[in-house]
Regions:
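Short loop/turn motifs that connect adjacent beta-strands in outer-membrane beta-barrel proteins
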Residues: 10-12, 40-46, 75-80, 117-125, ...
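C-terminal transmembrane beta-barrel domains of outer membrane proteins
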Residues: 190-350
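Flexible, solvent-exposed coil segments and beta strand-coil junctions
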Residues: 9-16, 43-50, 86-94, 107, ...
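Transmembrane beta-barrel outer-membrane domains
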Residues: 24-28, 59-63, 74, 101-107, ...
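Transmembrane beta-barrel strands of outer-membrane/channel proteins
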Residues: 16-22, 31-33, 47-53, 81-87, ...
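Outer-membrane beta-barrel initiation region
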Residues: 1-82, 118
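Extracellular loop and loop/strand-boundary signature of outer-membrane beta-barrel proteins
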Residues: 19-21, 54-56, 94-99, 136-146, ...
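Transmembrane beta-barrel wall of Gram-negative outer-membrane proteins
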Residues: 58-164
Length: 350
């Protein structure tokens, strides 16, 4: 007679997620580790911690950063709090003199979103954010400057989707945002500086998805309008490695611009000689636009790249191999590499 024993998974195992990566070469090392958990303290909340440490022997630099974040519901609101601290040290050579320079930074950010109303299948949400950062810069253990940065914004987001016949699904999103940015620097030996300005931006995004001949086809894009006083944190990235392989580490972020991406996923199939491993292929093409601007007349133009990816999915691991190449670049912010961009990533369950 067979005997069956019930095994129950520990409640922490289903909630904790670990991540990490390490880059080690002759110049130095760069490593990071993170842990995240869902519904650990209360229902529908999320908490996470990240730490990064990097050292470069060639540049004689040493830096580290740590941050913790917590997202939780409060009545009809979704609140997110994030706090972090970072430091760096590096050697500076100036006019034959070599000395040590260092800096520290402390940051706190709070954001909230709230559903407002819904009309004609479109949901409207209110968004508010505030963040502050205090930094110090020193040379040879003597204070050079203290700076303070503050950023506040409020906005309205409208989003909606519709499923048409034959499996065609379309989604749209519009974000209108306005706010103020404040930056001040105190110098012990010279005049202080203060800079405060307002800004606005409007961003449109849309996607269309459909399954055809068992392949999943998607077209999605984003375009942004903004004034020239927009903080760099609100810039839109129109081309770069975070979007597609093929740009060989180059990235372009601008005040106003947009991008359009077409990609397709193959149906999954079993890998031969690899029991329980499924694989699929992805083809993608992306093009970014930078409109002409008198303030940045040397950056306008286009950049495009294509990518082929192979994904392997096993019971306890996921592996991705991507090969991309830039097709063309008419903006001076990028150059067309003479070799393809190859990436490999793997994640394993613990």
């Amino acid at each position: 007679m067979d005997t069956f024993q019930e095994e129950r998974e520990h409640w922490l195992r289903s909630r904790l997620k670990f991540s990490g990566k390490t880059k080690l070469n002759s110049d130095g090392l760069d490593g990071s580790v993170g842990v995240a958990a869902d519904s650990l303290v209360g229902q529908n909340d999320a908490i996470g911690f990240d730490y990064r440490d990097a050292r470069s022997y060639g540049n004689d630099t040493d830096s580290s950063a740590a941050s913790i974040r917590y997202r939780f519901p409060a009545w009809a609101n979704q609140l997110r709090i994030e706090a972090g601290r970072s430091r760096y040290d590096h050697a500076v050579s100036d006019a034959g003199r070599r000395y040590n320079a260092s800096g520290e930074s402390r940051a706190l950010a709070v954001s909230a979103s709230r559903p407002l109303f819904s009309r004609f299948g479109i949901a409207f949400d209110g968004i508010a954010r505030h963040q502050g950062r205090d930094s110090t810069f020193s040379e040879e253990n003597s204070l050079v400057s203290e700076s303070r940065y503050q950023f506040s914004s409020v906005g309205l987001e409208a989003s909606g989707g519709h499923e048409f016949g034959a499996g065609l699904v379309a989604n749209t999103r519009v974000l209108a945002l306005s706010g103020r940015e404040f930056h001040s620097t105190d110098y012990p030996s010279q005049d202080d500086t203060v800079d405060e300005r307002g800004f606005y931006k409007v961003a449109f995004s849309a996607s269309v998805e459909q399954e055809l001949f068992q392949w999943n086809w998607r077209v999605n894009g984003r375009y942004q309008f903004a004034d020239e006083d927009l903080p760099s944190s609100e810039y839109i990235t129109v081309a770069g490695p975070s979007m597609l392989a093929g740009f060989n580490g180059q990235s372009v972020s601008v005040v106003s611009g947009g991008w359009l991406r077409l990609d397709t996923d193959s149906p999954a199939w079993s890998m031969p000689l690899m029991d329980g491993v499924l694989s699929r292929v992805n083809f993608a093409v992306l093009q970014g636009w930078i409109p002409y601007s008198g303030a940045r007349e040397d950056r306008f133009g286009k950049a495009s790249a294509g990518q082929v990816s192979l994904k392997l999915q096993g019971r306890t691991f996921t592996a991705n191999v991507s090969v991309g190449r830039m097709i063309r670049a008419s903006t001076t912010a990028m150059t067309t590499p003479d070799h393809p961009d190859v990436r490999f990533s793997m994640s394993m369950g613990i």
